[in-house]
Amino acid sequence: MIRLGDKMKDNFIKIIKSIIVFLLFVIVFAAGFILLGFFKGEKIENPISDISGPKDEFLFLLAGVDSTGEETGTRTDTLMLIKADSNNNTVDMISIPRDSYVSINGKMDKINAAHSYGGIDLTMSVVRDFLGINLDKYMVISFEAVIKGIDALGGMDVDVSQDVAAAMGISPGIHTMSGDEVLKYVRFRKGYQNADLGRINTQQDFLKQFIKEATKPSNLPKLPKVYAAMKPYIKTNMNIKDLSSLAMKFKFADSSNLNSVRLEGEGFNMGGISYYKIYPESIENIRSTYLNSFLRN
């Protein structure tokens, strides 16, 4: 017979683990440590006290850069909209190809150039205008954070698919990687049939694998060390109290609830430079299917 106390303990562990899963996803590695009190008394840059949009949905832009120390001069290597829906216990990862041909300050350019011209503020503005959405929250993560976080975790087992293995010239299956090796893995692009899109698929798959790895019972005690290693390389304007409250709604969230999509289009060359033209119908599909609650009036 299972005692009531045991049931309560099991439920508590499941809830705590699911919260950590969601929070880990929110900032890709570090926000899960909110539960351990690491943000108590710390100042969050430009905190946002009100969550815009419907109460059961949450949207922010995740940007991966070479360095978070400079506001301009660095292009984004990864751009991804993250939308969490507590009604359906789902998290959507909407990748924006970095070569997407968009308008930046009235001139056409690659979307990843926005950060080099005006930092995360201009990047946010370009994404808002390009998709016609309301968006005010962001997370900027330096790739140094990936190296530091994975190493603090003691390395990571990565399941490399047949297609990715063929592109990278390695054997498929499980590879134990260091932080530096993981970074090279998620940034690799030359061997794919379509370099940028192939890398997007790899990055989305990696996020799912990391969440599964980081939330293994044996790894949970390592999270404070992982957070301490990554914290200097992460910048956000999100209010930690809001994220903690939101995460409490995700009692049943796990890696199987993560949905990966991307803006579709086709590549073209102009002046010796490769660009990616997003199909208008793909924009409308993403807007109506995933971003309907955040559309501009």
Where are these regions (language model features)?
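Non-catalytic, solvent-exposed segments at the cell envelope interface
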Residues: 3-4, 9-297
